Regions:
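Glycine-rich SAM-binding Motif I of class I
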Residues: 31, 35
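A short SAM/SAH-binding and catalytic strip from SAM-dependent methyltransferases
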Residues: 84-95
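Short conserved loop adjoining the S-adenosyl-L-methionine
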Residues: 73-79
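Class I SAM-dependent methyltransferase "Motif I" SAM/SAH-binding loop
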Residues: 27-29
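S-adenosyl-L-methionine-dependent methyltransferase catalytic module, highlighting the catalytic core
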Residues: 99-103, 110-201
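Conserved alpha-helix/loop element of class I SAM-dependent methyltransferases that forms part
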Residues: 3-19
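Class I SAM-dependent methyltransferase SAM/SAH-binding core
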Residues: 36-73
Length: 201
């Protein structure tokens, strides 16, 4: 788990010992989380990834990954086909984050969702004092080149979860790649991750 990105490392830690559970990693990238879940916990991990080169990389590692678009292809999965769905740092790139959340909670019993927090104090400072869209560790790409089309804050996500009837089971906040406490997370956290259950579907 040491080589996993911080949010993926938390998921691997939390799911350790859940042998036989089924996990769908949406936007799975190079499959690092899936490989860790399979190798360390005996979890049946599947993935969806839009980038064909990353799909090939996953398949070469013996991972079960299909090329697909989270905005449309989650609809092909039956209700509660997985114990957990995972969407890490992909939500802001989706066309309709609200619909993606519906689908994650329809397809899985629970969902892990992580994202860069647009209300972090460095982001606020860049807008307030520089008058420009920020380029930070959490948002490293200039506005004209980023894949993010829907920036989100901790408070925005909590409001969306409530609107969707989802229950926030647990939450984690990160700054500098390390976990931080909950107080003041909307301005202190560079990244946030939530474990959700329920939903309207």
């Amino acid at each position: 788990m040491a080589d996993l990105r911080f949010d993926l490392a938390v998921i691997a830690r939390e799911l350790n010992g859940n042998s036989g559970k089924r996990v769908l990693d949406v936007g799975c990238g190079d499959g690092a989380l899936m490989a860790a879940l399979r190798d360390q916990s005996g979890i049946d991990a599947r993935g969806i990834e839009i980038n064909s080169e990353l799909v090939e990389k996953c398949v070469s590692r013996g991972l079960s990954v299909v090329q697909g678009d989270a905005d449309t292809d989650l609809a092909d999965y039956p209700d509660k086909a997985f114990d957990y769905t995972v969407l890490c740092q992909t939500l802001p790139t989706s066309t309709r984050p609200d619909r993606i959340l519906d689908e994650l909670l329809r397809v899985g019993e629970r969902a892990f969702v992580s994202f860069a927090n647009f209300a972090h104090w460095r982001t606020r400072s860049a807008l307030m004092f520089g008058g420009k869209m920020p380029v930070t560790q959490a948002l490293p790409v200039s506005w004209y080149a980023t894949q993010n089309i829907h920036h989100v804050t901790v408070e925005d996500f909590c409001a969306l979860a409530k609107e969707k009837g989802a229950r926030i089971e647990r939450r984690w906040f990160f700054s500098g790649g390390r976990e931080i406490g909950t107080p003041g997370a909307n301005w202190r956290a560079e990244f946030a991750m939530f474990e959700l259950s329920g939903g309207l579907n």
